[in-house]
Amino acid sequence: MTAAPADFARARSEFLSIDAPRVEDGAAIWRIARDSQVLDLNSSYSYLLWCRDFAATSAVARGENGEPIAFVTGYVRPDRPQTLVVWQVAVDQAHRGKGLAAALLDALTARVAADQVLSSVETTITPDNTASDRLFTSYAQRHDVALEKEVLFDGELFPEETHLPEVLYRIGPFAT
C-alpha cells in the first residue's frame, strides 16, 4: 500500500512546516513518542540531545501553533556515511492516518540527500509494528528502490524478556 497524492495533500494541510528540530522541541517530541504507545521510550534528556546533536538528520512537522505534531529522528551511520538510519517516527494521535509520517520521511531524506550522498535508508521495526512496516514498505515503493529485511537483534538479546526481535529494513540503493 502506498500513500496516495491525496494523502500527501491532506497531510500538508495539517501542518505549517517541516523543519529541523530545535532543543526547545525535545519535550514535545518525548511526549509524542510516549503517547505513541509503540515506540521504545527514551529518556526526556535523550530527546533534548537528539534535537541538539542530530537536528540535521531529524525533522519535525509543526502545527498551526508552531509546536511539533510529528517527528522523525535519524543519524548517519559512522561506518556507512551514505546511509541514513531512521531511529524513530511518530505522529501525534490527533494527526494520524493522513500521510504525515510519509511526508516527514520524504522531506527528511530529500534534505539529507541535498547535503550529502544518500545511498540507503535503514531502520528497525518489531514484527508487531504494522504501521511502521507499511510506512517503510510504501517509502521503498514510492522511490522505486529495493527493500531487504533481516533480523538485526533477536529478542533474547534485550534485557526485557518480552522484547520482540528488531528487524532491519534496508532500503536502497538510491540513484546518485
Swiss-Prot record:
Keywords: Acyltransferase, Transferase. PROSITE patterns: GNAT. The gene is ectA. It comes from the Bacteria. Its EC number is 2.3.1.178. One of its GO terms (biological process) is ectoine biosynthetic process. Residues 16-171 form the N-acetyltransferase domain. It is an enzyme of class 2 (transferase). GO terms for molecular function: diaminobutyrate acetyltransferase activity. Belongs to the acetyltransferase family. EctA subfamily. It comes from Streptomyces anulatus (Streptomyces chrysomallus). Transmembrane segments: none annotated. NCBIfam families: ectoine_EctA. This is L-2,4-diaminobutyric acid acetyltransferase. SUPFAM superfamilies: Acyl-CoA N-acyltransferases (Nat). InterPro entries: Acyl_CoA_acyltransferase, Ectoine_EctA, GNAT_dom. Pathway: Amine and polyamine biosynthesis; ectoine biosynthesis; L-ectoine from L-aspartate 4-semialdehyde: step 2/3. Coiled coil: none annotated.
